Amino acid sequence: HTYPNPCMRILDSAMVNVLGEYGGIGRPVEGHTWDIGRKWGYIQYDTEKKVTDTYCMYARDLIDIKQNDWCAAAVYTQTTDVEGEVNGFYTYDREVLKVDAKRVREANEAVINAPLEAPVQIVRPSAFHYKDPSAGVRNQLNLYALRNGDLTMQVTDFGARVISLFAPDRNGNIDDIIVGYGEGEKYVHNAGERFLGATVGRVANRIGGGRFTLDGVTYNLPKNNNGQTLHGGLLGIDMVVWKLKERTDSSITLSYTAPDGQDGFPGNLSIDLTYILTSDNGLDIAYKATTDKATPVNLSNHAFYNLHGSKGGTILDHVITINADKVTPVDKVLIPTGEHLAVEGTPFDFRQPHAIGERIGENHPQLAFCGGYDLNWELNVPSDGNLHSVCTVSDPTTGRKMEILTDQPGLQFYSGNFFDGSYCGKVEGQPIGYREALALE
């Protein structure tokens, strides 16, 4: 690309007009954009620490980029009041904090000498693109890495999805516990399971008959699942590209506005989603939504987990607890009947630890309807707006354990009943098999 400088000299037409940081992968930086009419330039910070922390964050991103063939990368720092570059563009701003060479060297050493925080099989940014058949062009998606404590996480802006989450086992071996794809193309063109890792809505789960009535008006929605509307419809919020709003080394906020009428829903719905990796090896997921019309909103995350790690295998040996006295039974098309089923004496009683596979094959109509576990557990939590522990999942083999805390009244536990091994995940040649992933929505 060329800088937007009217005085720039004309380059030799035989030369490749490319800068190092534009080697096939771009890192979106707020305030550093080529969109016409938007501010371009260096980001301004009010403290030296913010400059250094941000520099280190982007420098760590380069570690991911440099693993890709034919990719070059750079982080620019403005070290002087006037900067000249070979194409004739100059910047001059005395209000920008300058970064002295000593601090740059120290930051580089800190990044380079840091221990590798994730295995080499981390998904590469160059794999996150897709082809637009109508235009015949390749579009790049963004893949962001977050790090804190023992955790490393990857998130893409397509559907605000969790792509990877690397966590240690009892022996300190780090592996990816998220089941998904390693290429953006498979997410965009729906290679199999559409909702892998996605943020789903406007309404997660099913709307019976694809219609609802609100304030006396009936709204008809697209039916994308056995005559019902599942996870928002044909487009939802998972099949769109979200906008980067804010990012640190351990957190990211993505935003999307679903326009009035999208998938048949009323109102412009603006959503902010924030992922935060905490220092105690936690993942916080926070949602904020505003609308200009009354509209149903029920957002959720649809990450699929396998605590064995990237080698996969059945999740039937995972041990789960759910703090719930009742579940919400469904009919044959998985729409709630309006009843409340007590878990006492049923395969749905996880108030004490049980392996997932221990009772999944029992003769119960709800297991038959769902092909396994795929119900809403009515949680034993107060409606006080605070987070409460409601579920644990552990793998006796690796020692990995996750605890779910929420301020919501329900938890959908899905045991991966419809994976059939017909498509591969992130590991080449390794299909995602029957009940090799679980979701907690």
What would you call each of these model-derived segments?
Residues 62-69, 111-115, 207:
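Short secondary-structure junctions and interdomain/linker hinges
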Residues 77-119:
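Aromatic-rich peripheral "rim/lid" segments of glycoside hydrolase catalytic domains that contact
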Residues 52-56, 98, 269, 281:
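Conserved structured core elements
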